[in-house]
Amino acid sequence: CVCPYIDGKWDEVLELARSADLETIVSNTTEAGIAYTQGDSQFDQVPPNSFPAKLTRVLFERYKAFNGAADKGLAILSCELIDNNGKELQKCCNNYAKDWNLEPAFIDWMNNANTFCSTLVDRIVPGRIRDPKELAAMEEANGYHDAALDVGEVFGVWVIEGPAELEDKLPFKKAGVNVMVVPDVTPYKKRKV
């Protein structure tokens, strides 16, 4: 997990982009975070304003570090609550690449070596427990006080739209977690709503 605002160390984020071990980026910026506004971020800004601009900068750093090697592309899992979140993120990144006049070979690498995955998360978490009696009973059962005690439904699924080989890269199946890699999230979205 990387937060570029801890001590303002954007250079450390860019250093991670150059890591041969990096394979996956997961974003969860809220639906407002997947947005493009022309001129809001500059290539050399530290850091760029929007998440898509930051991601474009990270991808460009990686492209340069590995001389555009196709096998150094990343799986980018967008978890924002918007339709086609991966595709929307990719559109934003393309807009920034064009705004910044980045080389066509980079844009080609960004779109073909990287996989922008749309995802669907389905699990209801209603919020903090406010009933003092229920809270006390749960804390007694747990054996400790938890200031942020919450509950969630037992059912949960994360559906990732991507190539089948992504399932082998991600450790979810081995861990027994209900995560599926599918060619299209649409049927799962329809089932959810």
Q: What residue ranges belong to the model's regions?
A:
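Substrate/ligand-engaging "lid" and interaction regions
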Residues: 1-193
